[in-house]
Curated annotation (Swiss-Prot):
This is Ubiquitin carboxyl-terminal hydrolase 46. It is an enzyme of class 3 (hydrolase). It comes from the Eukaryota. It is found in: Cytoplasm. Belongs to the peptidase C19 family. USP12/USP46 subfamily. GO terms for biological process: adult feeding behavior; behavioral fear response; behavioral response to ethanol; protein deubiquitination; proteolysis; regulation of postsynaptic neurotransmitter receptor internalization; regulation of protein stability; regulation of synaptic transmission, GABAergic. The gene is Usp46. Coiled coil: none annotated. Detected in lung and spleen, and at lower levels in brain, kidney, testis and liver. Residues 35-365 form the USP domain.
């Protein structure tokens, strides 16, 4: 155990009582718990994502519902369900929990995380969501094979058919449509692509709305990049653009803050100032999109602190019952809404340490 962890444990009671005092006994939400997570050697990338997901209510509710079922052999989802259940059923309202079982399982299942080096929070989020979806799909498949699926359809799909959607997909999955218009015959072709999170490029002194608009900018395909048009049966100049066709329940936006620099032969951090609003409406939607006017509220932000992808630290800010909290491993603090501006990034292009929003979680209104 490190000196930092020992010091943290000594301060647990102080931090916890301070948090309860800051929130106030009358304002403290009923049946809510705010627990920090112990760092097991550069596991802040994991802790920060887990805290963000815990405060994405639809995700938390489904994980806890999974825990309530009679279960099976241990896997990453059972360990996550145990952790969420442990937080949700604590007698105390605030405190610290060691996610030891989850971390051990994670390291056992994926060599990428089986070390004490700093990892990328976005890579972990992607791995976690896909792994949970795979587990749920495999369980559904096994239930069908065992004849345990109640009210089963007699016309079941073939074995090689597309896997069933899970609650992970229902919460996070959106659809992009790639539209290409031939400039000779005006024929428009489109190809759909599903996503669980959306990665967008960042520029200096911009906003999330600007980043999303750039994501869907029209690109002209000409010269050597000409498009083969099936209607013209030849290569033609064309215009290509990406639009959002299906909006997810929770929109996870990944800001591409790490860029490979040829002259340095390594990735460096783009600490650009990117404003992320508390409310968001997407305008880069396709003409046939469902719920065009869907409004989103910011519920969590995973923040990267430092100057590079393999060094630094991750923290999370979340919105819970109308107020904001900062989770820094085992430390939990109440913060003002105005303090969120500190995590937009830096206005200077000079590479230095910064606390910058890295993964944003926006939840749609009912």
């Amino acid at each position: 155990m490190t000196v930092r962890n020992i010091a943290s444990i000594c301060n647990m009671g102080t931090n916890a009582s301070a948090l309860e005092k800051d929130i106030g006994p009358e304002q403290f939400p009923i049946n809510e718990h705010y627990f920090g997570l112990v760092n097991f050697g550069n596991t802040c990338y994991c802790n920060s994502v887990l805290q963000a997901l815990y405060f994405c209510r639809p995700f938390r509710e489904n994980v806890l519902a999974y825990k309530a079922q009679q279960k099976k052999k241990e896997n990453l989802l059972t360990c996550l369900a145990d952790l969420f259940h442990s937080i949700a059923t604590q007698k105390k309202k605030v405190g610290v929990i060691p996610p030891k079982k989850f971390i051990s399982r994670l390291r056992k299942e994926n060599d990428l995380f089986d070390n004490y080096m700093q990892q990328d929070a976005h890579e972990f989020l992607n791995y976690l969501l896909n792994t949970i979806a795979d587990i749920l799909q495999e369980e559904k498949k096994q239930e069908k094979q065992n004849g345990k699926l109640k009210n089963g359809n007699m016309n079941e799909p073939a074995e090689n058919s597309k896997p069933e959607l899970t609650w992970v997909h229902e919460i996070f999955q959106g659809t992009l449509t790639n539209e290409t218009r031939c400039l000779n015959c005006e024929t428009v072709s489109s190809k759909d692509e599903d996503f669980l999170d959306l990665s967008v490029d960042v520029e200096q002194n911009t906003s999330i709305t600007h980043c999303l608009r750039d994501f869907s900018n029209t690109e002209t395909l000409c010269s050597e990049q000409k498009y083969y048009c099936e209607t013209c049966c030849s290569k033609q100049e064309a215009q290509k653009r990406m639009r959002v066709k299906k909006l997810p329940m929770i929109l996870a936006l990944h800001l591409k803050r790490f860029k490979y620099m040829e002259q340095l032969h390594r990735y460096t951090k783009l600490s650009y100032r990117v404003v992320f609003p508390l409310e968001l409406r997407l305008f880069n939607t396709s003409s046939d999109a469902v719920n065009l006017d869907r409004m989103y509220d910011l519920v969590a932000v995973v923040v990267h602190c430092g100057s590079g992808p393999n060094r630094g630290h991750y923290i999370t800010i979340v919105k819970s019952h109308g107020f904001w909290l900062l989770f820094d491993d085992d430390i939990v603090e109440k913060i003002d809404a105005q303090a969120i501006e500190e995590f937009y990034g830096l206005t200077s292009d000079i590479s230095k340490n910064s606390e910058s929003g890295y993964i944003l979680f926006y939840q749609s209104r009912e």
